[in-house]
Amino acid sequence: KGVTVTGFKKGSNSKAVTGVETDKGVIDCEQVVVGAGPWARDFWNMLELPKTANIKGKDGKMHTTDMWTYWMLQEGVIGVEPDFLKMDNGKQPPVIHVDSTAPLYSDKTKKLITDKIWGIYYKPDIEGLGVQGGTSPYIVDKHFDKVNVDPYGIDSPEFQTTEAFNDMWCSALAHCQKRFEGKSDLYRKGPSGGLGCMTPDSFPIFDRFLENVYMIADANHGYKMIGVGELVAKEILGTESDLLKPFRFNRYEKGEL
């Protein structure tokens, strides 16, 4: 919504971007910072950057893979009381992550859901609607250029959580904490979740391209990346960050994964 970026204007004697093309006109610039989450692919394509990555394996050989892979991030809310997870000290708990190899049975039907490794996370919903969380995402089985990112999230007609997610996540909650047993019917049905645009190794890329374009491809780690803004700003001004250095694009060809 608002101004739409349609492309980039480049200098005649260099690869540097001199302007950002939008549906409202061209915005001249000296530096460009792209931090677009699931839309990283679109800006990458506009900048005409490579659609594949060459990765040096442990065997010393080069392997070619797609630059991007879309994952469907499955999330939901179970409508328990806002203080359902309150700790003994009266405070709300942190985000809880659980990975398990124990067989998982349905809280509703008691049938086996999976006997393979599974994982969930959950926390109090920030809007007080209950407990919010999700399971492991699944890979979208399409070439990244054929994935419809828009309309995004709850507006997407194609990418939504399913009844199978509902049963699995609520059952996993009951498996982890007895207080969730018999609460599956409180799951708030409705559109949720969204697409994530993943790099070849599912770790972020923080790097400069085309001389003056700084790409923050956070691999949809979201709020966990909230501290990078200051580090990126310092890099643009000439101070390299030791924290961001391992996440350069050339790590793939170097095999430094």
Short names for language-model regions:
Residues 8-160, 174, 180-183:
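Flavin-dependent oxidoreductases
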Residues 139, 143-148, 157-257:
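C-terminal catalytic lobe of FAD-dependent flavoproteins
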Residues 1-6:
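A conserved beta-strand/loop element that lines the FAD pocket in flavoprotein oxidoreductases
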